């Protein structure tokens, strides 16, 4: 039977752990961005039970957002973020990012459902939905309710824009 040191019993985790890449750390260390309410024990239990990683130590730090003035001149601060540095028993090496995307033609979907155009880290323009293609696919289905909902959506889109 395993011991649980954290406060919460996590059966199906609803906590998002974001692995931060690009920091100059030794291979036994990894940095995660976690919600503010997560503590060190929760991090250790999560990594141990979900990913079966043996954690040696956990160090956490809260980074405050920089102050700025909005358009009304009010001083605001964005939400703080918590980063956790985890030391593991076994070294961890990041997988290499793919350099060549020739296997996928532009416009085709990748196995995860994303588009080749949206693979850049910070996309400048969001991809526009091709309504003609959507309407053609819906018209292939001869369901009366779908056709009615398609017409309602088209009317709503015309009203807004």
From Swiss-Prot:
Keywords, A to Z, come to: Mitochondrion, Ribonucleoprotein, Ribosomal protein, Transit peptide
Which Gene Ontology cellular component terms are annotated? mitochondrial large ribosomal subunit; mitochondrion
Q: Name one GO biological process term.
A: mitochondrial translation
Kindly list the places in or outside the cell where this protein is found, as annotated in its UniProt entry: Mitochondrion
- InterPro entries attached to this UniProt entry: Nucleotide-bd_a/b_plait_sf, Ribosomal_uL23-like, Ribosomal_uL23/eL15/eS24_sf
Molecular function (GO) terms for this protein are: structural constituent of ribosome
Principal localization reads mitochondrion
The transit peptide segment here is: 1-34
Pfam families annotated for this entry?
Answer: Ribosomal_L23 (PF00276)
Q: Which PANTHER family match?
A: LARGE RIBOSOMAL SUBUNIT PROTEIN UL23M, RIBOSOMAL PROTEIN L23-RELATED
Q: What does this protein do?
A: Component of the mitochondrial ribosome (mitoribosome), a dedicated translation machinery responsible for the synthesis of mitochondrial genome-encoded proteins, including at least some of the essential transmembrane subunits of the mitochondrial respiratory chain. The mitoribosomes are attached to the mitochondrial inner membrane and translation products are cotranslationally integrated into the membrane.
Name the family.
Belongs to the universal ribosomal protein uL23 family.
Q: How does it assemble?
A: Component of the mitochondrial large ribosomal subunit (mt-LSU). Mature yeast 74S mitochondrial ribosomes consist of a small (37S) and a large (54S) subunit. The 37S small subunit contains a 15S ribosomal RNA (15S mt-rRNA) and at least 32 different proteins. The 54S large subunit contains a 21S rRNA (21S mt-rRNA) and at least 45 different proteins. uL23m forms the wall of the exit tunnel. Interacts with the C-terminus of OXA1.
Q: Tell me the protein's name.
A: Large ribosomal subunit protein uL23m
What organism does this protein naturally occur in?
A: Schizosaccharomyces pombe (strain 972 / ATCC 24843) (Fission yeast)
Provide the gene name from the record: mrp20
């Amino acid at each position: 039977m395993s011991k649980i040191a954290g406060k919460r019993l996590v059966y199906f985790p609803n906590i998002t752990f974001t692995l931060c890449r690009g920091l100059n750390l030794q291979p036994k260390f990894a940095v995660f961005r976690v919600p503010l309410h997560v503590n060190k024990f929760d991090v250790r239990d999560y990594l141990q039970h979900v990913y079966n990683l043996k954690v040696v130590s956990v160090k956490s730090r809260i980074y405050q957002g920089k102050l700025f003035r909005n358009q009304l001149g009010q001083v605001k601060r964005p939400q703080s973020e918590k980063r956790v540095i985890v030391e593991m028993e076994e070294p961890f090496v990041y997988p290499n990012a793919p350099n060549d995307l020739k296997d996928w033609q532009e416009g085709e979907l990748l196995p995860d459902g994303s588009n080749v155009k949206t693979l850049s880290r910070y996309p400048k323009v969001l991809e526009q939905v091709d309504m003609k293609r959507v309407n053609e696919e819906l018209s292939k289905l001869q369901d009366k309710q779908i056709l009615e909902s398609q017409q309602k959506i088209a009317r709503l889109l015309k009203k807004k824009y």
